[in-house]
Amino acid sequence: MADQRMDISSTISDFMSPDPADLISSSLSTSGMDCNRKRKGSSTDYQLDGFPFEEGMDTDKDDQHGRLEYTDQQGRIKNAREAHSQIEKRRRDKMNSFIDELASLVPTCNAMSRKLDKLTVLRMAVQHMKTLRGATNPYTEANYKPAFLSDDELKHLILRAADGFLFVVGCDRGKILFVSESVFKILNYSQNDLIGQSLFDYLHPKDIAKVKEQLSSSDTAPRERLIDAKTGLPVKTDITPGPSRLCSGARRSFFCRMKCNRPSVKVEDKDFPSTCSKKKADRKSFCTIHSTGYLKSWPPTKMGLDEDNEPDNEGCNLSCLVAIGRLHPHVVPQPVNGEIRVKPTEYVSRHAIDGKFVFVDQRATAILAYLPQELLGTSCYEYFHQDDIGHLAECHRQVLQTREKITTNCYKFKIKDGSFITLRSRWFSFMNPWTKEVEYIVSTNTVVSTNVLDSGDAAFPQLAASPHSMDSVLQAGEGGPKRTHPTVPGIPGGTRAGAGKIGRMIAEEIMEIHRIRGSSPSSCGSSPLNITSTPPPDTSSPGGKKILNGGTPDISSAGLLSGQIQDNSGYPYSDNSSILGENSHIGIDMIDNDQGSSSPSNDEAAMAVIMSLLEADAGLGGPVDFSDLPWPL
């Protein structure tokens, strides 16, 4: 019995003692379970009565479960690796299929006899895309030629219409491959003299670099060599020539000077020194040629040229410039009368609405001899000749009422030395878009030459008759004799003293007209520059005087609202006539009277009239009595 128990104990101890490999597999289980198992395996409190192997069987199940978990984990890792490899393989296969499809679409790759590496295929595809750039609307050569015309007939028609010569030049060396017979009419060279020669030998030395630049930058075909990434050797392509295309990047248009084979004149040595005659004999004249055309590509075999012997020929197409050269004249045709056209001498000035200078261009100093600061703040009427003031005042009034440009007749402008220069001006007014008021007048003044004034032809009809003087315009409506004005010491002859007041009175008149039109109910939607409308109903004062705007007496006869007339209703409106025309009462006479009648009594009377007008305008008084005025009405 004791022996039997010893055998059972040894069997259990052998069963409970794990193998080192089993210890490694059981390490995947928790540490608590390992400790439990060790304590259970080392303890001697086993209940062997009736259940001698139950605890050992539980431990075996745990070990088997750990082994199964380890096997499953190893299987999952292996399956994940296999799945990743399959994904990478499918990706590589898909990329290879796309590269093969791309190689079949690129002509340079499709023409290769051997399989290219991926990098070379991608490089050729990029260069092919660069070639197609800009050729969104390609046209073949057949689309440019009508069916009923042959090639020779079309060539002759083009040369006749272009009045030039056709030439074909290779882009690599500048060799003239073809030139039409019409080159003899322009360069005096025959067709045989130029074919096969270098174009650079017939160009001006300073134009060679420019022509080389036009020939080298080709966009019609790839000009750089393709290198295999594996071997490092240049790739030779055998491209089947297709229909040539014209794209916008291949267009060329440039000017260059070419030698003209003009017949030389024999120079005798006795007339000129030997060195001078030799230089003149060797000197060749050049003519300017305007070349327009396209860069095109042909295979060397199609051109009929022996290009196989050239060392740098790598099977690429021959890129050429096909252009038409036309003679560009050196001298612009002059008028029949031999007059040389030059840029007109002019300067720009800016004036306030009363004609005072607010800006003067710096070019005015070279024309008028005035510095800009000498003209600023002065009125332009102070420099006008007295015979031209009437016409210029008319233009001044028009430019304040319209937005159009006003061109004056030729007039005389006083320069710094006291003499006069003839000018013609273009005036236009600038209106503030917010306030709708004229802010300033811009004048472009052009100097008129003396021969234009002397001609007086149909181009300048206003020059045939001299403009009316200021006095004649003012006296025409009154029928009185022309007054003689005294000469003011210190003022050069030809100008009028106090002429600067004319511009101020014109500006005040236009402002008064705008004020009246702005207060009129019928002019609410009209422009402030439009001063013509239908007169409103009659408004009269109790004393029989004409009242304006419900209380303002009619003072147009006194010259304060000149340029207006009255109808039967008594409302003043403009007749669109000049402020200095026949119906006007503002002029040099009034200016001279104002200068000669400056006294305290006159000033007090004028102030009393102004106060009465203000009271009547505000409705504070009755009609104004003008009998106390020192001047007649």
UniProtKB/Swiss-Prot annotation:
Keywords: Acetylation, Activator, Biological rhythms, Cytoplasm, DNA-binding, Isopeptide bond, Nucleus, Phosphoprotein, Repeat, Transcription, Transcription regulation, Ubl conjugation. It is found in: Nucleus; Cytoplasm; Nucleus, PML body. Ubiquitinated, leading to its proteasomal degradation. Deubiquitinated by USP9X. O-glycosylated; contains O-GlcNAc. O-glycosylation by OGT prevents protein degradation by inhibiting ubiquitination. It also stabilizes the CLOCK-BMAL1 heterodimer thereby increasing CLOCK-BMAL1-mediated transcription of genes in the negative loop of the circadian clock such as PER1/2/3 and CRY1/2. The modification N6-acetyllysine is found at residue 545. GO terms for biological process: positive regulation of DNA-templated transcription; positive regulation of protein acetylation; response to redox state; rhythmic process. Residues 518-528 have a biased composition (Low complexity). The record marks 84, 87-88, 92 as: Interaction with E-box DNA. This is Basic helix-loop-helix ARNT-like protein 1. PROSITE patterns: BHLH, PAS. The keyword DNA-binding applies. The modification Phosphoserine is found at residues 17, 85, 97. Residues 150-222, 333-403 form the PAS domain. The record marks 132 as: Important for interaction with CLOCK. Residues 408-451 form the PAC domain. The gene is BMAL1. There is a cross-link at residue 266 (Glycyl lysine isopeptide (Lys-Gly) (interchain with G-Cter in SUMO)). A motif (Nuclear export signal 1) lies at residues 149-159. Gene3D superfamilies: Helix-loop-helix DNA-binding domain, PAS domain. Residues 24-33 have a biased composition (Polar residues). A motif (Nuclear localization signal) lies at residues 36-41. The keyword Transferase does not apply. A motif (Nuclear export signal 2) lies at residues 368-376. Residues 1-65, 472-499, 518-555 are annotated as: Disordered. There is a cross-link at residue 259 (Glycyl lysine isopeptide (Lys-Gly) (interchain with G-Cter in SUMO2 and SUMO3)).
